[in-house]
Amino acid sequence: MSVIDDVLEANELYSRTHGLRRPPPRPARKLAIRKCMDARRSIRTLGVTTGDAHIIRNAGGIVTDDSLRSLLVSHYLLDTERFMVINRTDCGLMHASEEELRTRIQNRTGTADIAPAFFFAFQHIEENGRHQLQILSTHPCIPTDVSF
């Protein structure tokens, strides 16, 4: 059985046993967390459980157009009032450059036409975290009553 089959089977079992007890789509803690995709960290390490918060993940915990879209949907359609940005202190994007990532992709695929155009590699975690918060706090579509 493949890893994908294992995950699908676990999801089917969960759906059968928890189907009627699913939490509502609006997060109970009115919180949206913008987080890195690090597989080593569970949301439970934050004291957050299923139904508490929207967890929006990507490489580096970067506020990209797509993650911003998710945060706006979280706020305007699902009533979150607080946004949190969490970066990992040993983030993989701190150990690579844009050029290195492009070269790896090109070497593996043979194509120079690489998407996404940017991977947003960075060197300093604190500076990156401040930059992500600045993007959110100054965005014209995020109201001033949203806390960070």
What would you call each of these model-derived segments?
Residues 1-29, 61-63, 73-78, 93-148:
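Divalent-metal-activated hydrolytic enzyme cores
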Residues 4, 46, 83-84, 132:
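Homeobox/homeodomain signature
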Residues 17-69:
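Conserved beta-strand-loop surface patch within small alpha/beta domains used
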Residues 53, 85, 146-147:
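Residue-level detector of family-conserved "landmark" positions at structurally sensitive sites
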Residues 78-88:
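Ordered, amphipathic secondary-structure segments that act as subunit-interaction surfaces
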